[in-house]
């Protein structure tokens, strides 16, 4: 139920009458007015005389309107304001009838969706960048579900590839020590340290061999500096997990880890039972830790899709390569045993840029290594086919802009294989990075800020905000405020813009933050808790209302259109921006207008208005995943 639908329809009907009267064969579009009034219709493209437009409007506007007022003409704009008391009646009735589903309209029910998000490598904890991915993906799921769409959330477990094998090699060496460490440390943190240490050892071993062969003094100095940087990585890791890391150095110090990892990966792809056991053990440990982190954020996934099962052991990735060879041999190159698909030439020949929404530059793509093992893109094509077979209208993949070319390659290969429909319904939901001032991240070197660390600090800082008022439950409140602050910080910016993560913004209690919205909700809740129950359908609208009340009524009435627009555009940030605007108006109103100590009928009207604001905030919190609070 949309309170603004009847006023809009009444205005559209009037605009149609005006258009007919001045001889226009179509009805101008209605838009929100940026000039005068609430709605506007532009007559610019119809070569209408402004004087004739005004004369026609003046002759037609004298009749009685139910929802419209102040009809005027400004140049070639036809403007109208709304009878706010009538909009208030529509809004209160909609809130009363729909409750926490207020905002839903049939127009935002747009299909069925498979949403893949997070999909972090199972070799270390989720870091701050994964946090943006996970929260964006989860909020898309929530937004689409709020609108009645069928949605499934999926996590792609990338358990193949050399990176995972590095972690498996290290874990296999120190397995008996790890059990003790796991009693005090999250499993993803432990495996992350092992992975970084094995990387460091592998690089040191490789660089030492280079140093033995190098004769040039300048190049030798460069190699020595690089060795020193990797040694410093090991020292830092030893400071946290000394026994485990020292054992890795002792056992792996002289081994060719690069070759071992490649061989292990080949054995894993062929389904070697011994390798499968150790790799899956490592992967499950990391996923256990990652699930715990996601649970703190209120994120649950419907399906965990293992790359090995879907793309490799099924033979699907191999079939992708062989089918491309069969269909398009002229676009296949063999380079030292590796198979390369000339995606650049294929796109040029078939002019696919607009068809598949591709970036201007498309490089060739390598499908297999020289040893025959598949690469990420090949396996991802196999996964895309698996996703398509789930039968959803659209598949949304929340993946950073860094993988724009990889995701373009997936769509190109699907098209080349004859799956044009699959390629077109695959949406790469791209997002930019999260920047922490003064921090450069590298998972290989173990240099990253984990999502848990961000959440812990958010909770600690939030505790300082709430412990004075509610010391007995400060810990519970701080956790919910901390989670809300992080979720809002990642959702309040357009996905295509980088985020500069600053605590003074994230925890700003005056505007544009999760805690600000939560505090606004608490204010509304507290008023209603002290008041008697009211019948929203029978609230009398006062003849005189405050400017802030007018603003609030129209703002609350706009909620269904915001949800509709956010759903169609897949933009949770529209919801965040709207809630911030609503909270700013409400807090200004809260300071100026007493509610509980006001005489009737104004008291009931204001309570109905407060309840409507609270209802919208609660619905928005569900979509954004922000925890609600009754005390703060």
From Swiss-Prot:
Gene3D superfamilies per the UniProt record, alphabetical: HUPs, Isoleucyl-tRNA Synthetase, Domain 1
A Pfam short name: DALR_1
Reactions this protein catalyses: tRNA(Arg) + L-arginine + ATP = L-arginyl-tRNA(Arg) + AMP + diphosphate
GO MF annotation list: arginine-tRNA ligase activity; ATP binding
GO biological process, one term: arginyl-tRNA aminoacylation
UniProt subcellular location: Cytoplasm
Residues annotated as signal peptide: none
GO cellular component: cytoplasm
Motif ('HIGH' region): 120-130
InterPro entries: Arg-tRNA-ligase (IPR001278), ArgRS_core (IPR035684), DALR_anticod-bd (IPR008909), Rossmann-like_a/b/a_fold (IPR014729), tRNAsynth_Ia_anticodon-bd (IPR009080)
Annotated EC: 6.1.1.19
Keywords: Aminoacyl-tRNA synthetase, ATP-binding, Cytoplasm, Ligase, Nucleotide-binding, Protein biosynthesis
UniProt cross-references to HAMAP family, sorted A to Z: Arg_tRNA_synth
PANTHER family cross-referenced by the UniProt entry: ARGININE--TRNA LIGASE, CYTOPLASMIC, ARGINYL-TRNA SYNTHETASE
Family, as annotated: Belongs to the class-I aminoacyl-tRNA synthetase family.
Designated name of the protein: Arginine--tRNA ligase
Species in which this protein is naturally found: Pyrobaculum islandicum (strain DSM 4184 / JCM 9189 / GEO3)
Lineage summary: Archaea, Thermoproteota, Thermoprotei, Thermoproteales, Thermoproteaceae
């Amino acid at each position: 139920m949309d309170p603004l639908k009847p006023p809009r329809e009444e205005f559209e009907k009037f605009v149609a009458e005006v258009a007919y009267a001045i001889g226009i064969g179509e009805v101008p579009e209605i838009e929100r007015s940026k000039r005068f009034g609430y709605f506007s219709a532009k007559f610019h493209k119809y070569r209408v005389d402004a004087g004739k437009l005004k004369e026609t409007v003046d002759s037609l506007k004298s009749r009685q309107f139910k929802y419209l007022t102040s009809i005027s003409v400004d140049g070639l704009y036809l403007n109208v304001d709304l009878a706010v008391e009538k909009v208030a009646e529509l809004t209160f009735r909609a809130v009363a009838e729909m409750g926490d589903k207020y905002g839903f309209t049939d127009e935002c029910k747009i299909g069925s969706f498979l949403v893949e998000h997070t999909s972090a490598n199972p070799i270390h904890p989720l870091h701050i960048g994964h946090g943006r991915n996970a929260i964006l993906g989860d909020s898309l799921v929530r937004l689409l579900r709020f609108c009645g769409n069928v949605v499934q959330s999926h996590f792609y477990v990338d358990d193949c590839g050399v990176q995972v094998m590095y972690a498996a090699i290290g874990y296999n060496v120190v397995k008996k020590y790890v059990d003790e460490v796991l009693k005090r440390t999250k499993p993803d943190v432990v495996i992350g340290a092992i992975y970084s240490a094995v990387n460091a050892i592998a690089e040191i071993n490789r660089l030492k061999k280079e140093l033995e062969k190098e004769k040039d003094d300048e190049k030798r100095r460069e190699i020595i500096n690089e060795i020193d940087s990797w040694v410093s990585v090991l020292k830092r890791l030893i400071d946290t997990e000394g026994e485990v890391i020292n054992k890795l150095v002792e056992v792996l110090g002289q081994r060719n880890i690069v070759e071992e990892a490649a061989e292990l990966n080949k054995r894993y792809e062929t389904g070697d039972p011994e390798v499968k056991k150790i790799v899956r053990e490592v992967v499950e440990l990391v996923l256990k830790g990652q699930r715990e982190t996601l649970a703190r954020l209120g994120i649950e996934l419907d399906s965990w899709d293992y790359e090995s099962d879907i793309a490799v052991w099924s033979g699907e990735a191999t079939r992708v390569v062989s089918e491309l060879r069969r269909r398009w041999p002229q676009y296949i190159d063999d380079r030292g045993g590796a198979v390369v698909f000339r995606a650049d030439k294929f796109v040029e020949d078939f002019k696919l840029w607009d068809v598949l929404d591709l970036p201007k530059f498309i490089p060739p793509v390598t499908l297999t290594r020289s040893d025959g093992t598949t690469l990420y893109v090949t396996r991802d094509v196999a996964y895309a086919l698996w996703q398509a077979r789930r039968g959803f209208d659209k598949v949304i993949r929340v993946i950073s802009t860094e993988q724009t070319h990889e995701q373009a390659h997936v769509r190109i290969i699907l098209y080349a294989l004859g799956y044009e429909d699959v390629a077109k319904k695959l949406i790469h939901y791209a997002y930019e990075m999260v920047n922490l001032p003064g921090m450069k991240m590298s998972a290989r070197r173990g240099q990253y800020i984990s999502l848990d660390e961000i959440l812990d600090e958010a909770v600690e800082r939030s505790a300082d905000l709430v412990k004075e008022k509610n010391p007995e439950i400060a810990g519970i409140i701080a956790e919910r405020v901390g989670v809300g602050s992080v979720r809002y910080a990642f959702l309040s910016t357009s996905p295509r813009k980088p985020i500069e993560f600053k605590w003074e913004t994230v925890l700003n209690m005056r505007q544009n933050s999760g805690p600000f919205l939560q505090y606004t909700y608490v204010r509304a809740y507290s008023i209603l808790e002290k008041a008697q129950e009211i019948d929203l359908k029978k609230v009398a609208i006062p003849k005189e209302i405050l400017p802030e009340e007018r603003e609030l009524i129209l703002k609350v009435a706009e909620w269904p259109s915001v949800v509709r627009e956010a759903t169609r555009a897949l933009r949770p940030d529209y919801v965040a921006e709207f809630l911030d605007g609503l909270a700013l108006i409400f807090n200004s109103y809260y300071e100026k207008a007493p509610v509980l100590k006001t005489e009737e009928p104004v008291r009931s009207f204001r309570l109905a208005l407060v309840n409507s604001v609270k209802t919208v905030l609660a619905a928005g919190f569900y979509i954004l995943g922000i925890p609600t609070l009754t005390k703060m």
